[in-house]
Amino acid sequence: DTGHDSIRNGVFFLRDKLEPDDFIIVHDAVRPILPRKAVDEVIRVAHENGNASSSIACHPPIVYTDDFKSGVTDVDREHVMLTASPQAYRYSLALECYEKAEKENKHQFTFTSSLLIHYGHRVYFAKGTTSNIKITKPEDLALFEALLSIPEEKLYS
């Protein structure tokens, strides 16, 4: 199963268990360093706007490529946010989008936020943290171990 399938299955499982105005929070298990303040911020922004995605401003230069060998244009990073989990959604909104995607056989969306955008919804940003790293490669473990030695209050300010 893909990440899309896992989240969709969870959303569909909750059909008779949640009220439409309840919220769900989605987080990647491969992102184990998550300060409580980051979760609180996602919840706060979601309650204000119906959804929220943990996000940070993009600082490194970004270049668009069509072949992964060379760059064809740079991307204005002043208008780019890096999003990650946790993400929170009003349950009725998530359910509506996953039901549409299921009917249209669209399963390419890794994040629910991408699905919302596809169906014309605005996604709101909650202040994230660079310490919320995704551990997918062996070298990520060294960074993870180093981050474990930093007090939580210094990981999110």
What is each stretch, according to the model?
Residues I7-R8, R36-V39, P138:
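Conserved strand-to-helix beginnings and helix N-cap segments that scaffold or border functional pockets
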Residues D1-P20:
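Short phosphate-binding loop-to-helix
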Residues F12, D16, R44, H118, ...:
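Short, well-ordered alpha-helices that flank and scaffold nucleotide-derived cofactor binding pockets
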Residues N132-S157:
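Hydrophobic helical membrane-anchoring modules
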Residues I33-A126, S157:
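Conserved core of the sugar-phosphate nucleotidyltransferase
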Residues D1-T2, A29-P32, T130-S131:
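Short glycine-rich anion-binding loops that position phosphate/pyrophosphate groups of nucleotides
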